Protein backbone atom coordinates (compact mmCIF):
# COMPACT_ATOMS: atom_id res chain seq x y z
CA UNK A 1 0.00 0.00 0.00
CA UNK A 2 2.80 2.57 0.75
CA UNK A 3 4.22 1.69 -2.67
CA UNK A 4 0.83 2.38 -4.25
CA UNK A 5 0.52 5.64 -2.35
CA UNK A 6 3.87 6.69 -3.74
CA UNK A 7 2.72 5.79 -7.26
CA UNK A 8 -0.41 7.85 -6.71
CA UNK A 9 1.76 10.87 -5.91
CA UNK A 10 4.20 10.21 -8.74
CA UNK A 11 1.38 10.23 -11.27
CA UNK A 12 -0.04 13.62 -10.20
CA UNK A 13 -2.68 11.97 -8.01
CA UNK A 14 -4.24 10.66 -11.23
CA UNK A 15 -5.66 14.12 -11.72
CA UNK A 16 -7.24 13.29 -15.08
CA UNK A 17 -8.95 10.27 -13.53
CA UNK A 18 -10.25 12.41 -10.70
CA UNK A 19 -11.70 14.84 -13.21
CA UNK A 20 -13.33 12.00 -15.12
CA UNK A 21 -14.69 10.40 -11.93
CA UNK A 22 -16.10 13.69 -10.67
CA UNK A 23 -17.99 14.24 -13.93
CA UNK A 24 -19.31 10.70 -13.94
CA UNK A 25 -20.47 11.02 -10.33
CA UNK A 26 -22.16 14.37 -10.89
CA UNK A 27 -23.79 13.63 -14.22
CA UNK A 28 -24.31 9.90 -14.08
CA UNK A 29 -24.65 8.43 -17.58
CA UNK A 30 -21.78 7.84 -19.94
CA UNK A 31 -22.64 10.46 -22.53
CA UNK A 32 -19.57 11.86 -24.25
CA UNK A 33 -17.36 11.21 -21.21
CA UNK A 34 -16.44 7.85 -22.72
CA UNK A 35 -14.52 9.58 -25.47
CA UNK A 36 -13.48 12.74 -23.68
CA UNK A 37 -9.91 13.97 -23.24
CA UNK A 38 -10.11 13.50 -19.45
CA UNK A 39 -10.75 9.79 -19.94
CA UNK A 40 -7.95 9.45 -22.50
CA UNK A 41 -5.48 11.17 -20.17
CA UNK A 42 -6.75 9.12 -17.26
CA UNK A 43 -6.18 5.85 -19.11
CA UNK A 44 -2.67 6.97 -20.04
CA UNK A 45 -1.88 7.75 -16.41
CA UNK A 46 -3.38 4.48 -15.27
CA UNK A 47 -1.30 2.43 -17.70
CA UNK A 48 1.87 3.80 -16.10
CA UNK A 49 0.91 2.47 -12.68
CA UNK A 50 2.19 -0.96 -11.55
CA UNK A 51 -0.60 -3.48 -12.08
CA UNK A 52 -1.01 -4.42 -8.40
CA UNK A 53 -1.46 -0.71 -7.63
CA UNK A 54 -4.10 0.08 -10.26
CA UNK A 55 -7.09 -0.55 -8.00
CA UNK A 56 -5.56 0.99 -4.85
CA UNK A 57 -4.69 4.21 -6.70
CA UNK A 58 -8.18 4.41 -8.21
CA UNK A 59 -9.63 4.03 -4.74
CA UNK A 60 -7.39 6.88 -3.58
CA UNK A 61 -8.49 9.02 -6.51
CA UNK A 62 -12.14 8.44 -5.60
CA UNK A 63 -11.48 9.27 -1.94
CA UNK A 64 -9.67 12.44 -2.92
CA UNK A 65 -12.83 13.60 -4.71
CA UNK A 66 -14.88 12.84 -1.60
CA UNK A 67 -12.53 14.80 0.64
CA UNK A 68 -12.63 17.77 -1.69
CA UNK A 69 -16.35 17.93 -1.09
CA UNK A 70 -17.23 17.86 -4.78
CA UNK A 71 -19.47 14.82 -4.48
CA UNK A 72 -22.89 15.32 -2.93
CA UNK A 73 -25.27 12.73 -1.54
CA UNK A 74 -25.22 8.94 -1.50
CA UNK A 75 -26.22 8.60 -5.14
CA UNK A 76 -23.19 10.53 -6.39
CA UNK A 77 -20.95 8.61 -4.00
CA UNK A 78 -22.24 5.31 -5.39
CA UNK A 79 -21.68 6.51 -8.96
CA UNK A 80 -18.20 7.74 -8.06
CA UNK A 81 -17.07 4.37 -6.73
CA UNK A 82 -18.81 2.40 -9.46
CA UNK A 83 -17.01 4.46 -12.10
CA UNK A 84 -13.68 4.03 -10.27
CA UNK A 85 -14.09 0.25 -10.10
CA UNK A 86 -14.86 0.11 -13.82
CA UNK A 87 -11.96 2.22 -15.04
CA UNK A 88 -9.51 -0.65 -15.62
CA UNK A 89 -12.12 -2.22 -17.93
CA UNK A 90 -12.88 1.03 -19.69
CA UNK A 91 -9.15 1.70 -20.14
CA UNK A 92 -8.65 -1.93 -21.24
CA UNK A 93 -5.84 -2.55 -18.79
CA UNK A 94 -4.94 -6.21 -19.25
CA UNK A 95 -5.09 -8.53 -16.27
CA UNK A 96 -6.75 -6.05 -13.95
CA UNK A 97 -10.40 -6.08 -14.98
CA UNK A 98 -12.87 -4.64 -12.53
CA UNK A 99 -11.65 -3.48 -9.11
CA UNK A 100 -13.22 -5.12 -6.09
CA UNK A 101 -12.92 -2.32 -3.52
CA UNK A 102 -16.02 -1.01 -1.79
CA UNK A 103 -16.38 2.51 -0.54
CA UNK A 104 -13.93 2.13 2.31
UniProtKB/Swiss-Prot annotation:
It comes from the Eukaryota. Gene3D superfamilies: Plant lipid-transfer and hydrophobic proteins. Heat stable 2S seed storage protein having sweetness-inducing activity. Keywords: Disulfide bond, Seed storage protein, Storage protein, Taste-modifying protein. CDD domains: AAI_SS. GO terms for molecular function: nutrient reservoir activity. This is Sweet protein mabinlin-3. Belongs to the 2S seed storage albumins family. InterPro entries: Bifun_inhib/LTP/seed_sf, Bifunc_inhib/LTP/seed_store, Napin/2SS/CON. The lineage of its organism: Eukaryota, Viridiplantae, Streptophyta, Embryophyta, Tracheophyta. Coiled coil: none annotated. Heterodimer of a small A and a large B chain linked by disulfide bonds. Disulfide bonds join 4-53, 17-42, 43-91, 55-99. Pfam families: Tryp_alpha_amyl.
Amino acid sequence: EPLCRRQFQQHQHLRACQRYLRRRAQRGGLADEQRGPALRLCCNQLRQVNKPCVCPVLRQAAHQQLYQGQIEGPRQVRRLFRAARNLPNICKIPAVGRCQFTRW
